[in-house]
Amino acid sequence: MPLYPPGAAVMAPIAGHTDIPFRRMIRRFGCRHAFTEMIDAGSLVFQGQQTLRLAQRGSDAGFLGIQLVGSDLPTLKRAAELINGMDFDVLDFNLGCPAPKVARKCEGIRFALEDPDGAVRAFETLVSASRLPDRKSVV
């Protein structure tokens, strides 16, 4: 069974844009599947105020995913455990962001390209730590 129904509109995470007001607006135009902005796993674990704001659902009752970026296994594990206590439908692991501030930390696409085995271990860590209702919920 697919994660999203065929033909579904899915709003990808976009840093600086997919905040609560933006998600509310796209819902009015029929987008049923949305994500938070990309969230740094370390910032979530250390409870940064800006990060906690990004991770809020607000009054959004629709399908909502959270996207994490990171490369440190214990930090990713702890971030997934924190997400277990939040109300998200899916956890997305970012292995594609080319932004310099992400690549400098060997995260996103640089992590996937330079340490593919590490990226696999990171993904496995997230899957094993996640308690989302469906295992396909970690993508």
Stretches found by the model and what they are:
Residues 3, 14-86:
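Glycine-rich, positively charged N-terminal anion/phosphate-binding segment
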Residues 4-9:
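Extreme N-terminal starter segment of soluble prokaryotic enzymes
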Residues 10, 35, 65-67, 92-94, ...:
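Conserved beta-strand positions in the central sheet of alpha/beta enzyme cores
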Residues 13, 70, 77-80, 84-89, ...:
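Conserved alpha/beta-domain cores
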Residues 38-49, 95-116:
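Glycine-rich, proline-tolerant flexible connector loops at the mouths of alpha/beta enzymes
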Residues 54-65, 111-134:
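Alpha-helix-loop-beta-strand connector modules within alpha/beta enzyme cores
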Residues 138-139:
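Conserved small/polar residues in nucleotide/adenosyl-binding loops
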